[in-house]
Each structure stands twice: as structure tokens, then as C-alpha cells.
Amino acid sequence: MSAPNARTTNWAGNVTFGSPRVHRPRTLDELRRVVRDSPRIRALGSGHSFNLVADSDADLVRLDGLPAEAEIDPEGRTVTVTAGTRYAELVTALHGRGFALANLASLPHISVAGSCATGTHGSGDGQRCLSAAVRAVQLLGPDGDLGWLSRDADPEVLPGAVVALGALGVVTRLSLEIEPAFTMTQRVRVGVALDEVADHVDDVFGAAYSVSLFTDWLGEGSVWLKQRTDRPEGAWRGGRPASGPVHPVPGMPPEPSTEQMGVVGPWHERLPHFRPELEPSAGRELQSEFYVPREAAGAAFTALRGIGHLLAPALYVAEVRTVRADDLWLSPAHGRDCVTFHFTWLPDPRAVAPVLAAVEERLLPLGARPHWGKLTAMDPADITARYERAADFERLTHALDPGGKFRNAFTDALFPRG
């Protein structure tokens, strides 16, 4: 099934995709025919990217029309899901069987395949990005053939095929690591001085299983502490406890936020910031994010504090999180623990552009890598130069997609072919 004359936009509305041909197959065989017959095609996720990573000038395909499946292997501790499944659907199925994922992103509304393709993450000193949970991927190749790559059978290749920006084929299924379900609490501390966080990064971000700092970079922020009930809490207690539930964006009603105030609840109702049944975040917005090496966190705090007067007027809110290193070739956390600096901008590209340039001027010399699905003004060659395995990934694209069916202008700029 296709919509030949409909222009598709992303969730934020800042991107209108270039192709009017958007396919939404209902069966795997239909998807295979669409891919086989298309000259160039890109798969769309849930539309929560803010750039042209998923765009195409030929064909687009949505996978959310395929039957959602979640096949749990209790002994192997994996769940195999169809690519268009959203985390909100997956976590309910897992929890009902007594299992969990190690971590979740801020939004449960996002698709599993799209999140893994771009290196989406949550927070936690011991937690890797969501993509690092992938044990195997099923890829639909340019000729419509299906094949699996796995950690066990293809240990040298799979790390290059997970955070792959859709450039290797259409991911149809993924197998993810799971663990026994657990319970958590969520507490928020407000009035936290940014200088205190900068001086005690390890204490603050080690205070709970998952920790986020929200701020406008003018002097104070709120720290969200998401703690497993089966793990000891850290000692840090800066600021003061919030007097009631809050939203990450100051002044917005707290109802979309997951339950706080230390109430014990299941993992999937505490790890995200937002409830799946309500509108996430601020609505219309722009986003950027940069992964800075953990050892440069203090310098990054100092640099951003120095331009707080520029940042605050352009922001809904900024968020700081931590991510553990992984081995995925194009993961922004490849080979190094990171502190991530996220910016939820007002939906005004002209106002945001000079402020984003000021952020990059300060963070890029610290070794920052941008999020693949968010806004950056970086030169594509500068981005790929920050990845030690970029050349290996380019060779993998040649091997799996020699004709370039799954490429687009975004990947062509990053990995040009002669």
C-alpha cells in the first residue's frame, strides 16, 4: 500500500520528506516487493529525528503496518521484535512476562529499529545506548532477500550493522538482550547549582541508576534520580526535594511525566520521562545533542555556563545525561564513556542557528560527536573523522548494498562513493 501524493513530515514538523511515495506494506512479502522494485528507498521510523537522516528522493517505506511481534526467549534472555514496534508496545509485552530492558530513552513513543539505527540512549553511568542491547538484526537487502547478522555468528560484522543509519538495508527484526523485571523509584531535586554538578560530576551522576540534569544553563537545574529498588542509592543529595511532580520543561503541567515522589513502580513506568499515552516533551520543538568524552565533562560545563545568556532564550530546556561506552562502529559512545549535552530548542530555526554554532564552537574541540538524528551544523567530513571505524562502515555498505539502493543525500555526504 502506498500514498502517492502525500508529503510526510517528521514529528516536530521541521522536516518535510522529499518523496511523495510513502509505502506502508501490511505483509513481509509486500515489503520485499516494494524494496526489490524501488531504485532507491529509505525506511521511516516513528519520525522523531530532526534532520534528513531518513529522507529519500525516490521511495519511503513505513514498517508500522507490519504485524507487531515480540517473541521472548526466556533461556537465551532475548526478545525478537518486528522493526516498526514502538518501545511503548514492547515494554508492556516484556513486563507481562516478567522481563525488562536495561534502559529506555526519554520517550517510549519511538520505534525500536529507528532508535537503534541512530544510537538513541537513556542515561546511567553503567548503561549503554539502546542499540548496544541488539544481539541480532534481520536485514532486507536490495534484491528483496532476507538475512540475519548476529553477535554469535558474525561478531566482526554486527557492531557495524546496528547503528547503521538505514544504509545497509531495511531492518525487519531485531533481537535484544533482556533481563528479569525490576522496580524503581523516581525523585526530583530542584534548585541544584550547576557549579555543584560541574565540580562533582561523578557524585551527581552516580547517585542513581539513571540520572538526568535539566537546566537552562543560567545557574541552576533539576536533577532526576531514577533508582532501582534492588540497588543501593548514591550519597549525593544536592538542592532540595521537589514539592510535587514536575515536567522537564519548567512551567509545563506535570501530567505527561512519569510518576515521581519516590513511589515504587515498574521499570518501564519510571525509566522514561514521559508516559506513552500522552503527548511527549514540549510538542513542536527542535533538538541537538553532543556526546562529550567523560573526562571533558567539567570543561563542557564551564563552556556552556559561559554562554548561558545565549542559550536560555533559545531553549525549552537542556538535559545532561551519561552513557557507557560500547563497541558499535557508528555509536557516538563508541569506545568511550560519555556525558551527553542535549538541547530542546524553540521551533525557530533562524534563532537557533547562531546559538547552535556557539555550542559547537565550544564542544567540538573537546571531542564531541553529534547525535545522528538531531540538528548539527558540522561538516559531514568532520563528523565521520570522529569515528575510528568509519572506513570499515563504508566498506560494509559496499558489501551489503553495492548499488546504493539504501543511500540518500545524508549518507552520501557522510560516506561519498567515487
Give the residues covered by each predicted segment.
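Structural signature of FAD isoalloxazine-binding scaffolds in flavoprotein oxidoreductases
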Residues: 51-71, 122-144, 170-177, 339
